[in-house]
Amino acid sequence: LSQKFYTIDKVKLTMAGKRIVLTADRSLMTNYRGNFLYGFIACGPYEVLPEWVFDKVFCPPVETDPITGEAKVAQVGLRRVESALLQGYKRDEIMTVNPDYIEKSIGADTKIVGINVMDPLGMAPVTTTMSPEKLSYVAMKFKKLCANIIQLKKKYDFKVVVGGNGAWELAKSDRMKVHGIDTVVVGEADELALDLFHELETGNAPELMHCYVKNIQNIPEITAPTVNSLIEAMRGCGRGCDFCDVNKRSKKDLPVERLQREAKINLDYGFDSVWLHSDEMLLYGCDNRDFQPNYDAITTLWKGLKDLGANFVGTTHMTFSAVAADPKLIKDISEINDMHKSGRWISTNLGIETVAPDMVKKHLGIKAKPFSPDEWGWVVREGAQILNKNHWFPAATIIIGWPDETPDQVQYTIDMMRDFRAFNFRGLVAPLLYQDFSEKNSMHFGNLNEAQFTLFWKCWENNLRVINDIIPIILRNKTYGPPMKIFMYGLIKAGTWAIMRYLRGLCK
């Protein structure tokens, strides 16, 4: 009987709506079946992959309360904002919700809806490369979310604020109007979130805000589980690449003790691993100008998190230069993870961008440190082999179509791809078309010259070879039953064949 009354109370609260509702589009509200690389599927064209395959096979929704729509896990960025708001609002006034259930949480009492975005209009390099002149899944899902919110806004008259890594795409008045947005926040909202939400309620909030955290102590700790057990280990990078927005942030490391507290929230929820988000994890604790990794700081962090009961500790980003600078570090964190004994491979993202020495000097800042720009090609090759030897699966990027790039410079990277094939590199290389933040000099697929298209082809030739080689590893996913394994095998085979056929057609 008590359970019945509890359910009735939840329904009543839901009908009135929460004062503040936080959400993200459906391409972000998923655990990606424990594989972050599935997130790149959202960058692909909506018309190619049936929506039920996207929603059920690759990106099933996060666990959700079916009565209230509350998401049990959410992006770490949403959790940060949620924690910041809890410094001034009551717990029962705020809810982070699954976008598929958003109408359950919005009502007459709702004052603000906050949306976290990654690539809302499909303008990021991965999306423009994978979905040239087509509607991507990530853009379609955001469009669908906004359509629902606009209808609810007409009924309940609340404010809509958007922030996150992709907020810059919406920082124009016409785009805001079309999507029903009142305020866009570009940058880091940790310190200003509470004041901003008060201003939104009183109608005094600006249309556009640019903000960055000045004091690491002002970044609030998460209080609830995050997607795929991801926690934020550090911000910024310090490498200085001229095309990267992350370079605008100063490097900040979060203390081990704090990371342990946040990791424990996810492990207590039921996750069996910890993922560290960083734009350059191997610079954690780095205290020198040579960018030599701090072995003690990194191994202490890995051990401290593994000892909480995690099966392994992964990270979203490394750099080849840090890997090549300390091969023993990679070996030892792999041993901490028991990767050799278990046979487990862990993926991580790394940027190659180009290996042409002149381009490295001009565009990649000090990405090669502690090595020289002239050594960058060797650094990438050496780093790739070190990672593979220690069971790390690189998901690397290169940039094609720099405005000042010559065919001879492209050839350096083509030669690197041939070397990858020669030593049986196990990893993906995503060729991304150059994107200018002002959109003036952005490269379009139809403008690639012969050398650039050859490089594009070599990357996908590598990717399809590797994907076919690792099908058995993909099918080990513990969320797949026997029927799903058979379906996935057929889908991967058909998908790789279709991609190669498409590329061969472009060659002709």
Q: What are the language-model segments listed below?
A:
Residues A16-L28, V213-N247, V256, Q260, ...:
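N-terminal pre-triad scaffold of radical SAM enzymes
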Residues L22, K264-F393, I400-W402:
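Conserved SAM/AdoMet-binding glycine-rich loop
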Residues F36-T68, P120-K144, K362-S372, F453-V466:
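A solvent-exposed, charged loop/short amphipathic helix patch at secondary-structure junctions
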Residues V113, L121-V126, E169-K172, W275-R289, ...:
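Flexible glycine/acidic-rich beta-alpha junction loops that bind and position SAM and/or redox cofactors
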Residues S2-W52, E63, I67, E93, ...:
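Radical SAM enzyme core and accessory elements
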Residues A171-H179, D332, D404-D419:
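Catalytic cores of alpha/beta
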Residues V11-K12, A16-V21, N31-F36, E70, ...:
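N-terminal [4Fe-4S]-dependent radical SAM core
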Residues G77, E93-E221:
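Glycine-rich beta-alpha loop elements in corrinoid/cobalamin-binding modules
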